[in-house]
């Protein structure tokens, strides 16, 4: 517990909040070859590797992921939600923040139905989250 004198001399420091999706906070100036402060809700990137990984205990599955080089030259691992996907190396994808709790190091999601990523086939519920068009009657 600080004394009144210590508080007068130093004051209280406000806590600095840390981003859960740090790669979305930067841009890149290709002329000056320098990172810029350009936060965005989503970023475009190119898939450099597409594969599967196994989750932490106690879960068991083959979760689909893509290693993505973003437009700001940061490389991140993004989860591909939904059943089945059409991504391969050099696909252009849009990513958003949002971690996958049982995959260590995965802090981003690929947005389905945007750019080269197709929506989930035959999806009836929660379609907007998976980029699926409204089915014909």
UniProtKB/Swiss-Prot annotation:
A GO molecular function term, named singly, is: rRNA binding
The answer to keyword Transferase applying to this record is no
Query: What CDD domains does the database record attribute to this sequence?
Result: Ribosomal_S12 (cd03368)
Q: Which PROSITE patterns match?
A: RIBOSOMAL_S12
Report the NCBIfam families cross-referenced here. Answer: rpsL_bact
Reported function: With S4 and S5 plays an important role in translational accuracy.
The similarity comment for this entry is: Belongs to the universal ribosomal protein uS12 family.
Q: Which HAMAP family match?
A: Ribosomal_uS12_B (MF_00403_B)
InterPro entries with a match to the protein in the record: NA-bd_OB-fold, Ribosomal_uS12, Ribosomal_uS12_bac
Query: RNA-binding as a keyword?
Result: yes
Q: Which UniProt keywords apply?
A: Ribonucleoprotein, Ribosomal protein, RNA-binding, rRNA-binding, tRNA-binding
Superkingdom of this protein's organism = Bacteria
Q: How does it assemble?
A: Part of the 30S ribosomal subunit. Contacts proteins S8 and S17. May interact with IF1 in the 30S initiation complex.
Q: Which organism is it from?
A: Lactiplantibacillus plantarum (strain ATCC BAA-793 / NCIMB 8826 / WCFS1)
| Protein name, entry field | Small ribosomal subunit protein uS12
Q: Tell me the leader sequence span.
A: none
List GO BP terms, alphabetically. Answer: translation
Q: Name one GO cellular component term.
A: small ribosomal subunit
